[in-house]
From Swiss-Prot:
Single biological process term from Gene Ontology: DNA recombination
Protein name: Recombination protein RecR
Keyword terms: DNA damage, DNA recombination, DNA repair, Metal-binding, Zinc, Zinc-finger
InterPro entries attached to this UniProt entry: DNA_Rcmb_RecR (IPR000093), Rcmb_RecR (IPR023627), Rcmb_RecR_Znf (IPR015967), TOPRIM_dom (IPR006171), TOPRIM_RecR (IPR034137)
Gene it is expressed from: recR
Family: Belongs to the RecR family.
Keyword DNA repair: yes
Described function: May play a role in DNA repair. It seems to be involved in an RecBC-independent recombinational process of DNA repair. It may act with RecF and RecO.
GO molecular function: DNA binding; zinc ion binding
UniProt domain Toprim: residue ranges: 83-178
Lineage: superkingdom: Bacteria
Disulfide topology: none
Length: 201
């Protein structure tokens, strides 16, 4: 039976780090050692930042983004285009679109996508709030920026049906060849979607 190498406090730190996405037990052990070695430069500021996050992080009451205030920084930005709402499944998707500078509209975070196999139904998403926002007379377009998966497309169709009575245009992200992508590395579904959604050159 192996003996304990460290005290329970350090083992607890390693176990908690191992719960983070992309970190297994070995990576968590390396991360813990790095934090301990850089206690003043990294561990103390990280602990402080985590405490601030615990105390101040809020979920935006309007769009579902994570920020230190509600409504969030995006929802209170007067420079944004109020005619566009971009619907995403998760906050990570919102952040990815923001990093890309892909839109100047507002967002709506569903919280997930419909997934009957995982027990996620319409009642588990913020779809009712989205429908209410779509009836705002300033809103002209709802962009469905959902993953090109079965669950993502099911969710997109469900939302499109619900928005039938709202006076808005419903669009979705184009699917196809990524920038820098080579055709022979793409799957058949991606190539088919790219061909169907081709545009003028």
């Amino acid at each position: 039976m192996p003996t304990a190498v460290t005290g329970p406090e350090i083992e607890r730190l390693i176990q908690l780090l191992a719960r983070l996405p992309g970190l297994g037990p070995r990576s968590a052990r390396r991360a813990a050692l790095h934090l301990i070695k850089k206690r003043e430069a990294l561990m103390a500021p990280l602990a402080s930042a985590l405490q601030v996050a615990i105390d101040r992080i809020r979920v935006c009451e309007t769009c579902g983004n994570i920020d230190t205030r509600s409504p969030c920084t995006i929802c209170t930005d007067a420079r944004r285009d109020p005619s566009i709402i971009v619907v995403v499944a998760d906050v990570a998707d919102l952040w990815a679109l923001e990093r890309a500078g892909a839109t100047n509209g507002f967002y709506h975070v569903l919280g997930a996508t419909l997934s009957p196999l995982d027990g996620v139904g319409p009642q588990d998403l913020t779809i009712d709030a989205l429908v209410a926002r779509a009836h705002d007379p300033r809103v002209a377009e709802i962009v469905l920026a959902l993953n090109a998966t079965v669950d993502g497309q099911t969710t997109a169709h469900y939302i499109t049906d619900l928005l039938g009575e709202a006076n808005v245009k419903v669009t979705r992200l184009a699917h196809g060849v990524p920038v820098g992508g080579e055709l022979d590395y793409l799957d058949e579904g991606t190539l088919s979607a790219a061909m169907r959604q081709r545009t003028l050159f």
